[in-house]
A protein has these predicted regions:
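Residues at alpha-helix caps and immediate loop-helix transition turns in enzyme cores, especially N-
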Residues: 37, 65-69, 177
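Short, conserved "post-DEAD/DEAH" coupling segment immediately C-terminal to helicase motif II
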Residues: 177-183
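Walker A/P-loop
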Residues: 17-39
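Walker A/P-loop NTP-binding motif
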Residues: 9-13, 34-49, 70-73
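A substrate-engagement module of RecA-like helicase motors
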Residues: 18, 29, 49-164, 168-172
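Well-ordered alpha-helical segments embedded in enzymatic catalytic cores
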Residues: 3-7, 36-40, 167-173
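Phosphate/oxyanion-binding active-site loops and adjacent basic polyanion-contact surfaces
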Residues: 1-5, 30-37, 62-63
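Conserved pre-motif I regulatory segment
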Residues: 1-25
């Protein structure tokens, strides 16, 4: 754990541009990789090295581990001013009853897409006044309440978050690449 935490710290603080470098790590399950990566990265952000942390994984269980680690950090330091969002694939996040894994993201077809930009401000305000940790369930609940697309809500909310948790395809896949952050 200590060696990994040190490497994460060095990767986050090494570059003169204060943007850090990329660090890819692989280790067995259960050794504390999540906290060993998150804690020094967040500490580096607090020192002015970077504005946003992307915790990208291949599995939902690892995303849940990152959410849990952030919740534990909040429990230890309740006044921690940290916002995190977990992004979910559009197919999994879609609330349209007729979508069945194939989102129909057209305003003419989907009530969550129709008028999205008329309602998004209120949905974001409601979330940003809350806990600061935004899971898939929290996004879905807010999306239902304000009738907005939960996938787009998560993307828009990510602009105000310090930590973005999601699938690594958001970085590597040109089809779902997060252009707002990685272009």
């Amino acid at each position: 754990q200590r060696a990994l935490a040190g490497e994460v710290w060095r990767a986050c603080t090494a570059a003169p541009s204060k943007k850090g470098t990329r660090l890819f790590c692989q280790a067995p399950t259960g050794i504390g990789k999540t906290m060993s990566a998150l804690f020094p990265a967040l500490k580096a952000m607090g020192s002015g090295c970077g504005e946003k942390l992307f915790y990208l994984t291949a599995r939902n269980t690892t995303q849940a581990a990152a959410e849990d680690a952030i919740a534990r950090l909040r429990a230890v330091q309740p006044d921690l001013a940290l916002r995190s969002v977990t992004l979910t694939a559009k197919e999994k996040a879609c609330l349209h009853p007729d979508a069945e894994g194939h989102p129909a993201c057209l305003p003419e077809v989907c009530p969550y897409a129709n008028g999205y930009y008329d309602r998004i401000k209120n949905a974001l305000a409601a979330l940003l006044d809350g806990s600061g940790q935004f899971s898939r369930a929290a996004l879905a609940d807010t999306a239902r309440q304000f009738t907005v697309c939960p996938f787009e809500l998560g993307l828009d909310l990510s602009e105000w978050c310090d930590v973005v948790i999601g699938d690594y395809n958001y970085l590597f896949d040109p089809v779902v690449h997060l252009k707002r952050f990685f272009d």
